[in-house]
Amino acid sequence: MSLKQSMENKDIALIDILDVILDKGVAIKGDLIISIAGVDLVYLDLRVLISSVETLVQAKEGNHKPITSEQFDKQKEELMDATGQPSKWTNPLGS
């Protein structure tokens, strides 16, 4: 059985697709030109990068060894301690 046939009969959830996209990353580039009577009125150069923060950090460091969420959180805490800046994502109510 080919890969295509095996995938046709398999239910794939949206969360599975998002998991793969965030793990590997996706780059999308496109151009949008709006013109009337052959005159270009609007030109948009679109570039979108969808990835998790962990994937981007690994790519920037050139580190291909996987980093766990716990290691990433530890590095984030060390960086916040070094800079003296509190995390803007913490809940001020403490819950």
UniProtKB/Swiss-Prot annotation:
A GO molecular-function descriptor: structural molecule activity
Cellular component annotations (GO), alphabetically ordered: gas vesicle; vesicle membrane
Biotech use: The minimal pNL29 gvp locus overexpressed in E.coli can be filled with Xe and used as a contrast agent for ultrasound and magnetic resonance imaging. Engineered gas vesicles (GV) can be used for noninvasive imaging in E.coli and mice. Heterologous GVs with 2 copies of gvpA plus gvpC from D.flosaquae and the gvpR-gvpU operon from this bacterium make GVs suitable for imaging of bacteria deep in mouse tissues (e.g. the gastrointestinal tract), or when expressed in tumor-homing bacteria, can be detected in tumors.
A Pfam family this chain is assigned to: Gas_vesicle
Record's keyword terms, sorted: Gas vesicle
Main location: other
Compartment(s) of residence: Gas vesicle
Keyword Membrane: no
Function: Probably a minor component of the gas vesicle. It is not clear what function gas vesicles perform in soil bacteria.
Family, similarity comment: Belongs to the gas vesicle GvpA family.
Name of the molecule in the record: Gas vesicle protein S
